[in-house]
Structure formats: structure tokens, C-alpha cells
């Protein structure tokens, strides 16, 4: 099965350059990369406004504005000198075939993880996290989930492909342990009896970052962690370009500080999802997503440099 294309994809949903202008490598499985970036241009599982399939391209495009900074503030070092990161482009699948996307993404992830790589993925709608969790759980065992979102995505509607059901399905499949997982920024209806610790947007906005991070560390412990960031966790003032925006969210400043605070966790996989550039203003949503993705890489580089 061919998981990725091995030539530049000039379609409307892809770019011919990597995130941060990092090297493109269409054969990442045999590379010496520490982290591999994969775009997943998929939005068939959305329940709101479509357009997330263009998210990976938008994130890469705006990331060129971040590529110039070497000793990034406040880290004061260049992530690229500590981590070998490559961008392998976008998952190639038949648009319109959700099952093929899911199977090919899981196979791609399993192959990367078996080769000793770690993954940072760009959605696409949030459903793409489920096949990624399946692959990571095969490699690392049951994981903790640190989940930034306006929605819990724990809804049991019986639909196989729905971006609001992944974290109902994942515990059922034994992929994640809700009792060691935390959902941050929630501000919509949710089930209080599913085992997850929910830190709603009201308390996240009112409490100190240090206090929140201390609680997250206590909940997660030393389990392997999958970190997923739905961009609608941010308030629409900072991230209007998404399918299901909800007011009352986090500022971009608070989100960045929270992500930086996760440095000491055993993070084994990461994604940023739900950027829909058709609804964006001056690329601020894509810029927020690209910046958060960069901060995720920096926390990995900081750990490697210790």
C-alpha cells in the first residue's frame, strides 16, 4: 500500500515546501529524522463548516513567517539545532473515502513509529486524531491524553466518522486512559461521567498557568502522552478560521504558555487540527496553529538539550 506520494503534490490542498521551510522528505521511514511532520487534508467528518482539508497548506504557508527566528524567544536556542525535523508532505488518499484515509494514516503512523520516529500531524478535522491514537497505542500502549478544545469530542452518536466522537471511541478501544487524561478549554455540553478531567475555559482563563500545569502533571503522571490541540480551543477573536468556533475561549498568549508548561511530560505524539482557512482573517488562525506547533517542537527540543 502506498501511504504517501513521493513527488511534489501541486493540488489545491498541498504546498511544495515544508513547515518552517524544513526539508521535505517523501521517504521519511528510512530518514534520520527525530520528528516527522505529516499533513492530513481531510474534513469529511466535520459537523460544522467544512474546509479543514486546507488546514495543512495554510499552516505551512504562514509558517514561513516563523522560519527566520533562530534563537527563538523566550527559549534562546534554535530548535533545528537540537531536533532533526522533516516534513513528509500530505497523506495521499482518495478524497471522499474516509475509511481509506483512516487506514492509510494509521499505517503511515505505525511505520514511522516502528522506525523510531515521532509524529507532529496537521489536520484536517479532529477525526484524524483517532487513527493516530490507534497507531501510537500499538507502539506505546495505553496513553494519557492532553486535549485542548472547545468541545470534549466524547459524544456517542453511533457515527463511524465524526469529529466529535474520537474520545468516546478511544477509551472503548483501550487507546487512552481517561483517568489520566485532561481536556482544557471546554465550553460546550459534556458528559461529566466519562472519567476525563475537564478544565473548562472559565477556570482556565481565571486560574494561573502554573496552577493548571501542576494539576495536569498530577493527572497525567509518567504515562506516555498524546497531545492534541484543536484550534477552536482559542477564542474566535484569536482563531476565527475554524469549523465550529465558540466564544469565551483561550487567548493565544495563554495557550502558548500552557503548551510550554507541558515540557516535562512524556509526550510521544502531537497534532494541531481544525484550521479552516476559508473563514480566517489575515491568516491569524493559521499563524496561531503554526506557532503552537512550533512551540510543541520547542518543548521536545528543550527536553533533548537537558
Curated annotation (Swiss-Prot):
Q: Which domain of life is it from?
A: Bacteria
The protein here is known as Agmatinase
Q: Which GO terms describe its molecular function?
A: agmatinase activity; manganese ion binding
What family does the entry list? Belongs to the arginase family. Agmatinase subfamily.
Q: Which Pfam families match?
A: Arginase (PF00491)
InterPro entries, sorted: Agmatinase, Agmatinase-rel, Ureohydrolase, Ureohydrolase_dom_sf, Ureohydrolase_Mn_BS
Q: Which cofactor does it need?
A: Mn(2+)
Q: Which PROSITE patterns match?
A: ARGINASE_1, ARGINASE_2
The gene designation is: speB
Q: Does the keyword Metal-binding apply?
A: yes
Pathway connected to this protein? Amine and polyamine biosynthesis; putrescine biosynthesis via agmatine pathway; putrescine from agmatine: step 1/1
Amino acid at each position: 500500500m502506498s501511504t504517501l506520494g513521493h513527488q511534489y503534490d501541486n493540488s489545491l490542498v498541498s504546498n511544495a515546501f515544508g513547515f518552517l521551510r524544513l526539508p521535505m522528505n517523501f521517504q521519511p521511514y528510512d530518514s534520520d529524522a527525530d520528528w516527522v511532520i505529516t499533513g492530513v487534508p481531510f474534513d469529511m467528518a466535520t459537523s460544522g463548516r467544512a474546509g479543514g482539508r486546507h488546514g495543512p497548506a495554510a499552516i505551512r504557508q504562514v509558517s514561513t513567517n516563523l522560519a527566520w527566528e533562530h534563537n527563538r524567544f523566550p527559549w534562546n536556542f534554535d530548535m533545528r539545532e537540537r531536533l532533526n525535523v522533516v516534513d513528509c508532505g500530505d497523506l495521499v488518499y482518495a478524497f471522499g473515502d474516509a475509511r481509506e484515509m483512516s487506514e492509510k494514516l494509521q499505517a503511515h503512523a505505525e511505520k514511522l513509529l516502528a522506525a523510531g520516529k515521532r509524529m507532529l500531524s496537521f489536520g484536517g478535522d479532529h477525526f484524524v486524531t483517532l487513527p493516530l491514537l490507534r497507531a501510537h497505542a500499538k507502539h506505546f500502549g495505553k496513553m494519557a491524553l492532553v486535549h485542548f478544545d472547545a468541545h470534549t469530542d466524547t459524544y456517542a452518536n453511533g457515527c463511524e466518522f465524526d469529529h466529535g466522537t474520537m474520545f468516546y471511541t478511544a477509551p472503548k478501544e483501550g487507546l487512552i486512559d481517561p483517568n489520566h487524561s485532561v481536556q482544557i478549554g471546554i465550553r460546550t455540553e459534556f458528559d461529566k461521567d466519562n472519567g476525563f478531567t475537564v478544565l473548562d475555559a472559565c477556570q482556565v482563563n481565571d486560574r494561573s498557568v502554573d496552577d493548571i500545569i501542576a494539576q495536569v502533571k498530577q493527572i497525567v503522571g509518567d504515562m506516555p502522552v498524546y497531545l492534541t490541540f484543536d484550534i477552536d480551543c482559542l477564542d474566535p477573536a484569536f482563531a476565527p478560521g475554524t469549523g465550529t468556533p465558540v466564544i469565551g475561549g483561550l487567548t493565544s498568549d495563554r495557550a502558548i504558555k500552557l503548551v510550554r508548561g507541558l515540557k516535562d511530560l512524556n509526550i510521544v505524539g502531537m497534532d494541531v487540527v481544525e484550521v479552516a482557512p476559508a473563514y480566517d482573517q489575515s491568516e491569524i488562525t493559521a499563524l496561531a496553529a503554526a506557532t503552537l506547533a512550533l512551540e510543541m517542537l520547542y518543548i521536545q527540543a528543550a527536553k533533548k538539550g537537558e
